[in-house]
Every structure is written in C-alpha cells, then in structure tokens.
Amino acid sequence: MQVRTARRVVAGVEARRAIDHERLAARVHYATLLLAYPLLLWLGRSTFFRHDEWRIVLGHTGAGSQPWDVFAPFDIHWSTAVVLIYRAVGAVAGSSSYLPYLGVSLAVHVVASHLLWRVLLRCGADRWIATGLVAAFLVLGAGWEALYWVLSLTSTLPLALVLFAALIADRAARGGRAGGLQPAEEGAGRGRICLPRLGARLSAPVTMLTLLAVMSGGPGVAMLVIPALVGLQRGGPRRAVSLVAPAAGVYALWLALAGSAILHHPGTTSGGGAVVGFVWDGLTASMATLLGPMGLGAAALFVLCAWMAVRAHARALPPLIPACAVGAVAVFALTALGRGNGGDATTSHYLYAGIGLLLPGAALALTDLVRRLRLPRTALLAGLGVVVAHSGAMLALDADALTHDDQASRSLLLAAARLSQDGTALPDSVPEPILGWAVSTADVERLRAQDVLVPPAALDPAVAAEVSLRIHVAVSATRIAGAGEAPQVSGIDGGTLSTAPAGCVVAAPSSANGFTVSVAYAQAGALHVEAVTPTLLQVYLRGTPQAPADEAAKVLIAPGDAQWVDAALPGTTLVLRVPTGSVRLCS
C-alpha cells in the first residue's frame, strides 16, 4: 500500500511539473510574440516601397484608379483584400512613410506565427519544440522578403486565414473544447487517433475565412486544399466540399468576370516537368531552411515523407499535418503555373508559405525523435536557441541589405522630384527602373504635388547626373515633340542589321543570347521600334554594346506593335538590349 501511495505521489509531482513546463512554454511563446513585433518593425524602419506595390500606391494617391478596380487582377491574382489594406493605410497615414504599411504587414505575420503555434500544438508537438520553431519562424531569415515587402501580404495573409480556418474545422470535430491538449491531441503524440466527424455549426466562419483567403492572392487559392482535407478526414467528401465550395465558386465567378485575361496568361513554357521541378525545389529549399545545403533539405524531406507514411499506416497522423503538407505542394504548383518565366522556387516570399506549411509535420517528427532518444530538456532548449539565433542573424543581415537598396531607390525618386521641376523631363520616363520601375516621371510630379515625395535641398552630383539622363529618356507610344535630327544606329553586338523600306533597318539576333544596338542622338529625337516577334526591349544609358549599364526603361512589345524611344537631351547615346526576337528600327 505504501509503495502504491508513493508511486501516486511521484506521478502527481511529475504531472504537475509537466503542466508547469507547458505553462512556461506558453508564456515564453507569448513573450516572443510581444518582443518580436517591435524588433521586426525596428529592423525595417528605413525600408520603402518597391516593385509592383508602387502600382497600388499610385492608385490610392490619385493616379486615376476607380473604386471597382480593387476587383481587377493584380498581376494575375485576385488581391482585393491586399489592395484594400493598402488603400486603408494610405487613407489614414498617407504614403510619405513605409512604416504604417509595414506595421500592418508585420502584425499579420505575428498573428500567422501564433496560429501556426496553435496548429503545432493541435498536432501533438511538444510545447517547447513548438515554441522554439515558431520563434525561429517569427524571425525567419529565409523569408525576409515576406516580412519586409508589404506586398507579400499575398502570402502571409492567406496563410493566417487558412490556418485559422483549419483550426476551426479541426476544433469542431473535438467537441468545441478549447485550451490545452485535447484527448485526441494526447494520442497524437503517441498512438492511434480517433477521427470524430466535423460538426456543421462552425462551417460559416470557415467559409468566411476561405473567401478572404482567395481574395488575398494566389496562395490563398492553393491553400483551399487544407480545410478541404481536414473536412474530408473529419466528415467525408460532402463535408469537405461544403467547407471550400463557396470560396471556390466565388473565385471561379471572379475568374470568369474580372480575370478573363488570366486565361490567356502564357504560364510556364516548359510543361509539366518544369512545374514538378519548381515544386521539388520549393519543398527541398523549405526543408533546408534550418539545415543548410539543399542536399540536406532533400534528405530531410524524404525522411519526413517516410515518417508521415508510417504514422498514416498506423492511423496516428493528425489530419492537419498531411493537409498542410499537401497545401505546400499546391502553393508551389500554382505558383509555377502562374509564372511565365518559370521563376525561382527558392525566392524568399515563396519559401515563407512552404516553411510554414511543412512545420507541423517537422515539429511532430522532432517531438517523436526527442521522446525516443530521451534527450534532456536543456539540450533541446539549447538546440532550439541556436536555431532561433541563426534565423534572426540572417534576417538582420537581409534587412540591412534591403534597407540599403530601398534608400538608394528613394534617393533617386527624390532627385527626380527635384530635377523634374524645370518642365523638360519626359512624362513617360522612369527615374528609377530597378525597384521603382512602375513609377514614371509624371507619377513623381504627382507625388511631389501631394507631398509624398518632398524634393531635397541639395543633390549628390553623381545621383543628379544619373537621374537627369533618365528623366530625359522614355519609351512611349508617342514621338517626342520638337524632334530634330534623326538618331543613328551606330553599332550592333550579337546580331545583324539589314536594310528595310522607308530608310529602316531590321535588327536580328545571330545567337540565342539576344543582341544590343547602339543608337546615337545628336539632337533631341525619337527612334521608332517595331517588334517583328514578341520582344522585351530594354534601354540603357551611357553603355557600350559589350557592357550596357544604367538601365533607363524596359517594355514588352507585342508582334506588330511599336514604341518610340525618345531622348530629350542632345548627345545622348543609348543601348537597346533585345533578349529575344527581332525589331525594325526607323527614324
């Protein structure tokens, strides 16, 4: 009797210790959320608008956007929710600072991280492992672009919404009990899992969340498979369809009405093999985030798949794990299908969703390993600390490099705001074609009038010279007014020139690497460029055919279409780079 009593006492003490450890892990998690947000905001305090998001910013600063344009395809995606966030922040805080936009974006990331922590716990992962892995996800160096490019809300917002929807769907099947480990969760870590049927009463919030997800970007459409698979395992095919059919139907309607141009998008040109390769690269790079080389990522992915197969065979695999894993595959596959040039699956804002969706399986697999090896808790915490520190250090370096690039871009736009005041700049010119390629000089003047871009009192001479040339060179549908002597084609590299009627010449490639053409403007003038085949025309300043430099503009010209390359400053020499196709050049 005394032995039995002693055992009960020991068991009670161990149970209380386990509960204390779980509570401590939860407190540490909430502390990391509270600390990470201001830290992330501070690291990105000097970032600025870049790439496609300028199109949205110009819309809400009076660039001719109509209210219903929020439903138009952005690139090839339905991004109404993200556009509305930009417009709401712009209406409240203006666009002179990037920080308000970044604050909203990082808040979404922090919420997504907390929901991911909930998913890891729901799957039966050890609380300390879940807390450590999510802390690393909070400062995800491999996903720096998703954190510091606000337009990556098209990835972070769908992830948060779909994880929330999946948790609701999974919770409904557990009798609606909240907090702590549920009976099914306790079995998730060690034994067979009971799969109760999903109740219908929580279908409405799942439907609303999935609707918002598909309105937030392409990843949201791909992630519909996650609640669908949870519903399939919890309530069968009918329940799965009922959860995602409204969102899928609304997306199909939008595709038919507003997104018809997407149906003509070229997509990937290399067929199914390119899609499979893109998916494989994305998954292995996601797994390699914490391990280093891609080879280790491939090995880890194979081990994870084998572990999932063993658990599934034993009916001990929580439904959220295969659902999220299939969601990761779907995200990379849809991304590959939507990119005309194939793209790079290891781009950081693509990896963000892949890492987040593979983390539930990785967390439970690591939990199984730790329990099997009986690793001391101190060793586990030390290892997780190294992972978090490594991820945070990578993020700090990437944020610093990003800030440098953004500030360089901003300085060029501010210089254009000052130099364009004399009225000689071409409206269609592009002062900063690398990160600000969507901003024309006319846009700069509009932003200056609205005090979004305030011209500096003094300019660096080198910056002034560079911007002065750029704002006087443009590719447009109209010829520059007052054009003088016709520009002369002075040389070609990588191609051949042949005469054509009306004093024109045809420039054609002599290899698969494209060609460059040098054009000299003795006076202000315009060169007529007509595409013989689909052509991406890139215009450079002060370059040579062998080494063009200082890109000024680029435009895609369709077959039979034509553009004018205008130069307003006498003595300008331009280099036209044509990666593919042939062009007809006329004065």
PLM feature spans:
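Transmembrane-helix signature of polytopic, membrane-embedded enzymes
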Residues: 116, 120-140, 160, 179, ...
